[in-house]
């Protein structure tokens, strides 16, 4: 019997150590690695990923890093600036990924580094 699949959404976030290409790359690679490993994803499961970054991160586009470092050429990516809120987490990169998973699979949302305080229930 063929398994039913559904489109599911996975949220997550991390923080970069600073506003350099290398620091952003390090954070994005770790976040995508965790997204994939925690949810047992393959490239074919990933449909799209939207990145947001706080206004203090402008050295590069997180999506270009994810596309390059993970060979995700067929995934739709979008970068946006996160809405500014005073006292928000600095150097924060958030994601929302659309994935195709078996209906009965639950998702695991990776909240890493300084972003773990955003969702203590999911860390």
What residue spans do the PLM features occupy?
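Terminal domain-initiation and capping elements
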Residues: 1-123
């Amino acid at each position: 019997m063929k398994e039913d699949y559904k489109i599911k959404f996975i949220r997550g976030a991390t923080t970069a150590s600073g506003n350099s290409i290398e620091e952003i790359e390090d954070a994005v690679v770790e976040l995508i690695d965790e997204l994939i490993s925690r949810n047992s994803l393959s490239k074919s499961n990933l449909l799209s990923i939207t990145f947001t970054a706080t206004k203090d991160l402008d050295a590069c586009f997180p999506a270009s890093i994810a596309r390059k470092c993970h060979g995700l050429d067929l995934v739709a990516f979008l970068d946006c600036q996160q809405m500014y809120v005073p006292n928000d987490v600095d150097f924060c990169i958030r994601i929302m990924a659309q994935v195709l998973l078996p209906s009965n699979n639950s998702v695991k949302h990776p909240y890493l580094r300084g972003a773990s305080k955003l969702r203590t229930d999911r860390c």
